[in-house]
Amino acid sequence: IYDYLYGKNASTADIWKDETHTLRSLLYAMLLPSANEAAYIVADYMSGSSIDNFVAMMNDEAARIGCTGTTFTDPCGLDPGNVTTARDAYLLVRVAMGYDAFAQAAGEESYQMPASTKHDSPYTILTSDKLVSPSSNYYRPYTKGGKTGSLDDWQNFAGWHTQDGETYVSVVLHSPKTDEDPRPALTETAELMDWAFATFTVTAALDTTQPITELPIVYSSQTDTVMIYPADDMQTLLP
């Protein structure tokens, strides 16, 4: 694992060889500082020490949930053979956010990694998703969680946001980094969702208590018309 990651400028949670961690701690390590070694450790554990088997499991699961443009080639995303689309990233987030452990971890600003044989005391890891960090200029209270993905020159972000009881998923891919903004995908996500919440509202298109129309009745001795009501409520997103 460490031989593969060496020299790749991989993000890390400072997890060392021969340390012991729970899967929960490794989940936080993957989601907050994007710890590549944590992803590989989980893959090794879950697959019976076969990274290839785990990658095959990832691709099978992606296909099962409906991804059509995604191919995984490693557990952490460093390999350039990993590809996906905005639609597929949306599907992955929509499924992942349904798991309570994932949703809770993805929305945390920090986490205390436990003491171990390599760390005399617990230590703090911080999230790369600054949209959930109140101390950050990127902070947006409506963002509930998400995952960054970064290489040297660009950044991705997929996350979910809640306002007025409705939840929205956003995906920003291949946003170029600049000297002025090292987290451009977060900037673009914040601008996108600020605009969306200022521009669109969820409105009732159909209401079972409100008639759609009134129709005439030809053969009736008691009434000349009948009111038509929808069978179900329906909401829609309107500007």
Question: Where are the model-predicted features located?
Answer:
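Active-site-adjacent loops and short helices of periplasmic peptidoglycan-processing enzymes
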Residues: I1-R87, A96-D100
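Domain-terminus/edge residues, biased toward the C-terminal soluble/receptor-binding domains
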Residues: C67-T68, P80-T84, D88, V93-P239
